[in-house]
């Protein structure tokens, strides 16, 4: 028991004064480490500043180099727009001119075919003549009498220009041309020889003439067809 008590007292001895005197050395070492860390931090800051300046110069150079590329892209864009405009011009303008020409021709014919004060309202006028646009169908002889009752004559054709006008506004009609037989010439109701070509059919009894969109044709006089009348001013 006494031996154990001695050991216990030895373990509870106060600290060695020499060990306490060694603490300032530890503080000096800490100060040195702190100075080294500060120096290292300053070096890192200088390096970071240099890297930032270098990156700024590099980005500035990139901006300077991208300017010509932007210029080239702009020029290419303008060229594309010019090419597109040229294509549109080549395609659109000819069709527009053609349409204007057709409209001009139609307007000219329409102006010539306006209602005239000398003609009834249901009639149209063209080149000093009034035209009745019929809707009912009659034989050639009946059509001739119907036009006479309207103080006019069955549709007649005086020249090529008039025939073009009539084929533009009419689908078909009897005209004042007939013949006695297939062995006789075509004549008008005034007894004048008809100068325009009439396309013959295979039927010998087709001795009356009709106006169609595709030209003049012979037809059977007894068949019912649409007729139109003409009155010269």
Swiss-Prot record:
Keyword 4Fe-4S: no
Motif (Immunoreceptor tyrosine-based inhibition motif (ITIM)): 6-11, 38-43
PTM description: Phosphorylated.
Localization per Swiss-Prot or TrEMBL: Cell membrane
Annotated region described as Disordered, given as residue ranges: 1-28
GO MF annotation, one: transmembrane signaling receptor activity
Major location (coarse): membrane
Tissue specificity annotation: Natural killer cells.
Function, in words: Immune inhibitory receptor involved in self-nonself discrimination. In complex with KLRD1 on cytotoxic and regulatory lymphocyte subsets, recognizes non-classical major histocompatibility (MHC) class Ib molecule MHC-E loaded with self-peptides derived from the signal sequence of classical MHC class Ia molecules. Enables cytotoxic cells to monitor the expression of MHC class I molecules in healthy cells and to tolerate self.
Transmembrane segments: 71-93
The keyword Cell wall biogenesis/degradation appears for this protein: no
Glycosylation sites: 102-103, 151
Membrane topology annotation: Single-pass type II membrane protein
Domain statement: The cytosolic N-terminus contains two immunoreceptor tyrosine-based inhibitory motifs (ITIMs), which are essential for the association with INPP5D/SHIP-1 and INPPL1/SHIP-2 phosphatases and functional inhibition.
Extracellular topological domain residue ranges: 94-233
Keywords from the UniProt entry: Adaptive immunity, Cell membrane, Disulfide bond, Glycoprotein, Immunity, Innate immunity, Lectin, Membrane, Phosphoprotein, Receptor, Signal-anchor, Transmembrane, Transmembrane helix
The protein's name: NKG2-A/NKG2-B type II integral membrane protein
Subunit structure comment from the entry: Heterodimer with KLRD1; disulfide-linked. KLRD1-KLRC1 heterodimer interacts with peptide-bound MHC-E-B2M heterotrimeric complex. Competes with KLRC2 for its interaction with MHC-E. Interacts (via ITIM) with INPP5D/SHIP-1 and INPPL1/SHIP-2 (via SH2 domain).
GO CC terms in record: external side of plasma membrane; plasma membrane
GO biological process, one term: positive regulation of natural killer cell mediated cytotoxicity
Disulfide bridge positions per record: 119-130, 147-229, 208-221
């Amino acid at each position: 028991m006494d031996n154990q008590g001695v050991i216990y007292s030895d373990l509870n001895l106060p600290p060695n004064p020499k060990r306490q005197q060694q603490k300032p050395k530890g503080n000096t070492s800490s100060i040195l480490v702190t100075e080294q860390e500060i120096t290292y931090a300053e070096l890192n800051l200088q390096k970071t500043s240099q890297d930032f300046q270098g990156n700024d110069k590099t980005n500035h150079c990139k901006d300077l180099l991208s300017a010509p590329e932007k210029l080239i892209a702009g020029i290419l864009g303008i060229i594309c727009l010019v090419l597109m405009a040229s294509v549109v011009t080549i395609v659109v303008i000819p069709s527009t001119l053609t349409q204007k020409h057709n409209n001009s021709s139609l307007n000219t014919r329409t102006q010539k075919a306006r209602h005239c004060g000398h003609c009834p309202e249901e009639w149209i006028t063209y080149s000093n003549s009034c035209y009745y646009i019929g809707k009912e169908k009659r034989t050639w002889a009946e059509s001739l009498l119907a036009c006479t009752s309207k103080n006019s004559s069955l549709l007649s054709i005086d020249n090529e220009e008039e025939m073009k006008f009539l084929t533009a506004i009419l689908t078909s009609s009897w005209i004042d041309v007939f013949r006695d037989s297939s062995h006789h010439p075509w004549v008008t109701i005034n007894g004048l020889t008809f100068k325009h070509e009439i396309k013959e059919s295979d039927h010998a009894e087709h001795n009356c003439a009709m106006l169609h969109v595709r030209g003049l044709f012979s037809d059977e006089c007894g068949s019912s067809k649409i007729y139109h009348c003409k009155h010269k001013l």
